[in-house]
Amino acid sequence: DCLKFGWKCNPRNDKCCSGLKCGSNHNWCKLHI
């Protein structure tokens, strides 16, 4: 299962959904541009 937009995440183990990226400075899934 992947982490959805706005969900807390770990930038060293990015499990955000496709099209999202874990931001290393705020630790939540944001849009990957």
From Swiss-Prot:
It is found in: Secreted. GO terms for cellular component: extracellular region. One of its GO terms (molecular function) is sodium channel regulator activity. Disulfide bonds join 2-17, 9-22, 16-29. It comes from the Eukaryota. The modification Isoleucine amide is found at residue 33. SUPFAM superfamilies: omega toxin-like (SSF57059). Expressed by the venom gland. Pfam families: Toxin_12 (PF07740). The presence of a 'disulfide through disulfide knot' structurally defines this protein as a knottin. Belongs to the neurotoxin 10 (Hwtx-1) family. 55 (ProTx-III) subfamily. Negative results: does not affect human voltage-gated calcium channels (Cav) or nicotinic acetylcholine receptors (nAChR) at 5 uM. This is Mu-theraphotoxin-Tp1a. It comes from Thrixopelma pruriens (Peruvian green velvet tarantula).
